[in-house]
Amino acid sequence: MPRGSQTATIISIPRDTLVANGGGREVRFNSLYKGLPPDALMEGVRKVTGLGVDRWIKVDFDAFMGFVDALGGVAVTVDKRMYYEDDAAKYIIDLKPGEQVLDGKQALGFVRYRQDALGDIARVARQQQLFMSLAKAAINPAHIFKVGEFMDIVDKYVVNDMNLYEYAAIGMRALKVGPSSFETMTLPGRFSGPYWEADEAEVGRLIESIKGGGDR
């Protein structure tokens, strides 16, 4: 969200996006996360978007479920029957299609599911839908009394390099523009076998448009 802009833009980077690692070898974007310091992921974002990353925040599954439950659930439209069992990780996704309010565990299944033709690209769209619904729920005045509960979740499960002032500044800017001025999009690109290959020209145009506050 550039200074002076009335729009907050969230860009999703698909997990299978090709990016050069520290050794110059092209790898999946998600390989920069597991077992590596945040700097590796921040550098990966810079490589695929051209944007420097000043701060980072890591929200784990427990934090995600806690936030959703603290908000009383999240309203989404489940677009298809979703059923998946992972014996190794010991979790089950079991959702039926239609408009509904999901609790934390169900919402986590919704944003993790990718057993369909478009795989992670379809999952990204569901994650964006859920984020927008969460943003709308979060600004409900009734939740002002749950600030302490939210902060307990942050203290217990969220890892970041931000201070309290920066949290407050981001929150105030988000409240100022409101969720109706949030927009979500996926890193422009195309499938290249099992990978997502960023379209450098389209990415460049998108980033410049965001910086200038223009139409996308």
PLM-predicted stretches and their roles:
Residues 1-216:
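Non-catalytic, solvent-exposed segments at the cell envelope interface
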